[in-house]
Regions:
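Juxtamembrane helix-loop-helix connectors linking adjacent transmembrane helices
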Residues: 3-50, 56-66, 149-150
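Aromatic-anchored segments of alpha-helical transmembrane domains
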Residues: 6-13, 78-87, 129-141
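Juxtamembrane helix-entry segments on the extracytoplasmic side of multipass membrane proteins
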Residues: 25-37, 90-103, 152-160
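Hydrophobic residues within alpha-helical transmembrane segments
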Residues: 38, 76-83, 98, 102, ...
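Active-site His/Glu-centered metal-binding helix of metallohydrolases
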Residues: 45-50, 54-55, 59, 83, ...
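Membrane-interface helix/loop boundary segments of multi-pass membrane proteins
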Residues: 46-76, 93, 116-120
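Hydrophobic alpha-helical segments embedded in the membrane of multi-pass proteins
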Residues: 100-114
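C-terminal membrane module of polytopic membrane proteins
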Residues: 129-167
Length: 167
């Protein structure tokens, strides 16, 4: 069902954010938006090559292709992917970065599982880039804040609704 798709959730939350969070704030100029989008695509390519193409694949070879080995490779690569986002502490609020790390870790587990299931890194590159573009739209389209700072400003009801959806 389309409602169960992560892309539906991304689109739904993006439209809500664009429509209601900042109605009086002007958008960034189109060339800057397109540059951001290209940047997000390139980040998706680079992170997938490193975290799924190299790290997850190496872990899978180490732990084996039995069910337990696949799970272990997914979990370890996901935790490493989440930890890599700790570098955002240099410029963003700690709570937002913590939430971003938790999200990135769970996303890393999911993307590793998709990569192992499909055997196609381009599938995860597409999904990762689409999610990064959606995050950019939510956090930076208006040129006012980062994604981590956006998450820091969320009230409890918004964070709980995301948690319920993920469960």
């Amino acid at each position: 069902c389309i409602r169960d798709s992560p892309l539906f959730f991304i689109g739904y939350t993006t439209v809500g954010t664009l429509a209601f969070d900042r109605p009086d704030t002007p958008l960034l100029p189109l060339p800057r938006i397109l540059t951001f989008m290209l940047n997000m695509i390139l980040v998706g390519v680079a992170e997938e090559l490193v975290f799924r193409g190299i790290i997850a694949q190496t872990l899978l070879e180490r732990y084996g292709t039995a069910r337990a080995g696949v799970w272990k490779a997914c979990l370890v690569s996901g935790v490493l992917f989440g930890a890599a986002h700790l570098s955002n502490l240099l410029g963003s609020a700690p709570f937002g970065v913590l939430m971003q790390c938790v999200f990135a870790a769970s996303l890393g587990v999911m993307l590793a599982a998709i990569y192992f299931r499909t055997g196609n890194l381009w599938v995860t590159v597409f999904l990762h880039s689409a999610m990064d573009i959606a995050a950019m739209l939510i956090g930076g389209l208006y040129g006012t804040t980062s994604v981590a700072e956006s998450v820091s400003g969320y009230d409890a009801s918004r964070l709980v609704s995301v948690a319920v959806y993920l469960i």
